Amino acid sequence: MILGANGERLSKRHGAVSVTQYRDDGYLPEALLNYLARLGWSHGDEEIFSREQLIEWFDLSSISRSPAKFNPEKLHWINQQYLKEADNTRLAELIIPFLEKDGCHVAGGTNLELVVALLKERVNTIEELADAAVYFYRPLEPTDELKIQYFNTETKPILVGLIEKFNHIEWTRESIHHEIKTTAKHHDVKLPKIAMPLRVMVTGEIHTHSIDAVLELLGREETLARMNSHLSSFPD
């Protein structure tokens, strides 16, 4: 028997859903199988195992006699481990429906496999992976609060100068990082003073992967277009 976190029999009141709902929510089938098998059975301290290992190791004598409690956080964690090891081509195919549902046009945009490789370490589900990838395929408008916090008269001329520098450098993560770091040193400001408004201009968010890696994948043309589009949002 599977119980909810409160010790009661698992039911719809606990958010119990069908197997297909877990698929639609972005869980990998092998992760769900791993989690369900581990609910009432164990093989030492092993938490992650393949289908083949499950077949090899499974023994009725190792089944717990006590009811198991369903733990969504544990399922998240197991799914995350599988996502980290999953093939990027497969993950790219899996997130396309989520991105299209969010109004993104993947064809002709940033290489989706490279985006997946960059982002998959920090997410728990395919749905979260797609959410994290949205800004690569359509610009996100920063909130007014973010504009007030990061778009100011002090940083505007610095970013205008950075746009000029970005026009002429080799478009690699290393070169982008070097230019941001050099610009910060030249203006005697800390790196976040430039990186944060730059991140907001380009992604519309403040929590992303390293900004140099994001810009490299986004590409020079799209990066500069987004930066230029937000210069008018800075106070004079």
Model-derived features: positions:
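Short coil/loop linkers at secondary-structure junctions
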Residues: 28, 42, 61, 105-107, ...
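Short runs of predominantly hydrophobic/aromatic residues within well-ordered alpha helices
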Residues: 29, 51, 92, 112-116, ...
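Alpha-helical recognition segments enriched in aromatics with Gly/Pro capping
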Residues: 1-83, 96-97, 178, 196-202, ...
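Short, mixed-charge aromatic SLiMs
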Residues: 56-63, 102, 144-148, 185-187, ...
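Charged substrate- and nucleic-acid-binding regions of tRNA-handling and nucleotidyl-transfer enzymes
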Residues: 170-234
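Small-residue-rich helix-loop
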Residues: 88-189
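Short polybasic/polar patches that bind polyanions
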Residues: 23, 37, 56, 100, ...
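Short, surface-exposed helix-loop/turn micro-motifs enriched in polar/charged residues
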Residues: 43-46, 67, 107-111, 190, ...
